[in-house]
């Protein structure tokens, strides 16, 4: 990805200081999603490393990962799998507990959403500490999926999430980096 595209995408992301608490800068992609050119470029760049590769499913993490993941799945002619918070899916699920910055939560997916051996890419808007992405990777592997990559619009490298995923053998692709929290 060229520097102009990186700059354009970074400029389309709103930064909100002291949200949700003092000292945090919230990176809001709703402005990127609302800008047709930036949204298209972001999706094109998320898809680029996988062009020409058979990817069976895109797993999008609640909630912004649903928006981006659906678009990525469409472009790659892949199926889409929502990974949701506990209690949000109506059929038989598989579930895993995962670590958050300040506690533990659970995520789940339909048990039959991915078949053993299928190649899956994780998609979300942002990787920070990596708790959600690591949990999703473990959940998918628990049912036999091959997690071949993870892509995010934003990386907050100071928080170490990318490194945690890479330590699990997941190739990580991001578009924009922001320092700090």
UniProtKB/Swiss-Prot annotation:
Disulfide bonds listed in the record: none
Entry GO MF terms: adenine binding; adenine phosphoribosyltransferase activity; AMP binding
Subcellular location: Cytoplasm
Assembly mode: Homodimer.
PANTHER family: ADENINE PHOSPHORIBOSYLTRANSFERASE
Job description of the protein: Catalyzes a salvage reaction resulting in the formation of AMP, that is energically less costly than de novo synthesis.
Name of the molecule in the record: Adenine phosphoribosyltransferase
Protein's gene: apt
